[in-house]
Regions:
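PLP-dependent class I/II
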Residues: 1-213
Length: 213
């Protein structure tokens, strides 16, 4: 169960960064906001909040459709029930992910707490610049090999390319988020149980094959 910061913060100053891509969830809806709690608790914190607001006003512009949708969606009488049901379903998928990937050597991840995505991190000692997955389509194979021959390519990005071409599973390398870790992000949005389990079973098998290649 996800717990809102406002429920536990008490009288301490805090900032919660929100976005409807995760709040609803509505992936790709680039509209976020900041919630300040106990803004006047200290002069320094109040100045920080004002600085963030000033920076936001001159640098950030959210897409218009999500902005217009917020009041209609969040004020709908069924919204909170929908969110409760969605969290239960996402929690179930998180359990399936743990069952299917949790015992695979060479990776680690934490159970989600209401998020519709998860991040899998590789043991970097097991990654090399020569690992691969079998690709049956010769054109795809040539294309992927032309991409990964770049000596500067992050090793998690290399895995992502091979996974997409070999298994038609699309994930996002976490090096693309300016992280020093190497791994990938997956979503838990697939609603069909059989499809979800098949995808993550194939993902797990591909991870093992790749690390052992």
């Amino acid at each position: 169960k996800a717990v809102g910061l406002a429920e536990v913060i008490g009288d301490h100053p805090a900032i919660s960064l929100k976005g409807i891509s995760k709040e609803f969830p509505w992936p790709g809806a680039r509209c976020g906001w900041m919630e300040f709690y106990n803004r006047e608790a200290s002069e320094e914190f109040a100045k920080l909040c004002q600085t963030l607001e000033n920076a936001k006003m001159i640098e950030v512009c959210a897409t218009i459709l999500p902005q217009l949708a917020i009041p209609k969606i969040m004020s709908h009488p069924h919204y909170f029930r929908y969110r409760e049901d969605a969290n239960v379903k996402i929690g179930q998928r998180s359990d399936w992910m743990r069952e299917l990937l949790g015992s695979i050597p060479g990776i680690k991840f934490n159970p989600t707490q209401g998020a519709f995505y998860n991040t899998v991190v590789f043991d970097e000692k097991l990654l090399t610049a020569t690992q691969s997955l079998p690709i049956t389509n010769s054109q795809l194979k040539d294309l992927v090999e032309s991409w990964v021959e770049d000596p500067g390519i992050p090793l998690d990005k290399r895995f992502v390319y091979y996974l997409l071409a070999s298994e038609q599973i699309c994930v996002v390398p976490i090096s693309s988020f300016c992280s020093d870790l190497r791994g990938f992000r997956v979503t838990l949005l697939e609603e069909n149980e059989a499809q979800f389990k098949d995808t993550f079973s194939r993902l797990g098998a591909a991870i093992t094959r790749y690390l052992n290649s």
